Design a protein with these regions (language model features):
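AAA+ ATPase "lid" subdomain C-terminal helix
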Residues: 67-71, 298-306, 318-339, 353, ...
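C-terminal engagement/docking regions of AAA+ P-loop ATPases
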Residues: 309, 329-382
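An accessory alpha-helical subdomain
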Residues: 308-316
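Conserved ASCE/P-loop NTPase catalytic core
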Residues: 2-263, 274-291, 299, 304-308
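Amphipathic alpha-helical interaction segments
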Residues: 56, 60, 83, 288-292, ...
Length: 382
């Protein structure tokens, strides 16, 4: 197999040099697919630091990427949905060329915007290009009820029209939204159900045809984007749901889950907990206490007073471990002890980490969040 010629990014500044280099443009989904294939062949893990998904979510995600699908991660809170999306950045090529000054990352060989067409028509092979790093090709938007079509797709900019003395019928007066600006990259919408239904409808054409429409302009922009969405399976927030035709257009829906055993949960907590070096020197924590803390989350997920539709985030055990260490550290400071252990009595200090991270059903509200937290610790110790 013939080895691909390595492109010298620092020596290519214009379209003519890019053509001479033999560079071939490819779609972002093709790019991610090719890099995933290399990663799998080299026996590397494309999702480093994601634990407990080795036989479930990661293979599903790899299959979706190989199929060049847009992806919806569906799962309860604290299941690493956004982290999975963010780690896809590493599957992009390190650098890609774009028309210099383009707002929508125009491919020099397949320009989209009027700006790029005009620049190429004017300068030809002398059209300046710049190399964009993969970290800048990732866009993310948290869906909130106030997000508008203009935010996502774009709108006419009357100030730009006035300053440039242009008619509203001129393409140059368009102010592009975050989706066109993420062209040739990965775009993530977190908590998709929180997006108003009419805004979700605006995404239909982008997902089906890959193009956008702005304020009645007869303009077709076939965007090149890998879309990743995250959502909760149950509408426990009462803010909305994913409209069926939109769900139908997202090719792969991947179900995430909580750790299936304490060992995996323990590894995640130890990886994510922010225990300071000074705390590690002063406070020792036994494996038994760590396991009791993990058991609190497992007990909560099956507890009759806790709303299972809401879920119990992995953030509970992370915050609880930090609080347990801080509780022992505080005791050591008060008694002028150089070193100490986390005792079972220190677990009272993890109650604030529990009460804010569990949603209670009606009976649980009657019992009270403090008492429910105490009962969960009590069951875990037993």
């Amino acid at each position: 197999m013939k080895k691909a010629k390595k492109i010298q990014y620092d020596s290519i500044y214009n379209l003519g040099q890019l053509k001479a280099s033999g560079y071939k443009s490819k779609s972002v989904k093709e790019e991610v697919r090719n890099n995933l294939i290399k990663t799998i062949q080299e026996k590397e893990n494309p999702f480093v630091g994601i634990m407990g998904y080795e036989d479930t979510v990661i293979p599903d995600t790899e299959r979706a990427i190989l199929s060049q699908h847009n992806i919806l991660f569906l799962g309860l809170r604290g299941q690493a949905k956004t982290r999975m999306a963010r780690q896809m950045i590493d599957l992009l090529d390190e650098y890609i060329p774009v028309i210099a000054g383009s707002e929508v990352n125009d491919d020099p060989f397949k320009p989209l915007s009027r700006y790029a067409y005009d620049l190429i028509a004017e300068k030809g092979d002398d059209t300046p290009i710049e190399w964009v790093h993969r970290t800048t090709r990732y866009g993310e938007k948290l869906a909130t009820p106030d997000v508008s079509v203009a935010d996502l797709i774009g709108d006419i900019d009357p100030i730009k029209a006035a300053n440039l003395k242009l008619s509203f019928s001129d393409e140059k007066v368009i102010h592009y939204g975050i989706i066109p600006r993420s062209n040739r990259g990965i775009f993530v919408i977190n908590e998709l159900p929180d997006l108003q239904a009419r805004i979700q409808v605006a995404l239909f054409n982008i997902l089906q045809e890959g193009d956008i429409q702005i304020r009645g302009f007869k303009l077709r922009m076939p965007l090149d984007i890998l879309f990743v969405f995250t959502a909760n399976p149950e509408d426990y927030t009462n803010r909305g749901s994913i409209v069926t035709p939109l769900k139908d257009r997202i090719e792969s829906q991947i179900l995430t889950h909580y750790p299936k055993n304490i060992e995996t949960s323990l590894a995640i907590t130890e990886q994510e907990a922010n225990i300071l070096p000074a705390q590690k020197e002063r406070v020792n924590i036994s494996d038994l206490v760590k396991r009791i803390i993990e058991q609190v989350a497992f007990e909560a997920r099956s507890n009759e007073y806790v709303d299972r539709k809401s879920g119990v985030s992995a953030r509970l055990t992370i915050a609880a471990l930090e609080n347990a260490v801080s509780s022992a550290e505080r005791r050591a400071i008060i008694h002028n002890e150089a070193n100490t252990q986390v005792w079972i009595s220190d677990l009272n200090g993890i109650i604030p980490a529990i009460t804010g991270k569990i949603e209670l059903v009606y009976e649980g509200e009657q019992e009270g969040p403090y008492q429910v937290a105490v009962n969960l610790i009590d069951k875990s110790v037993r």
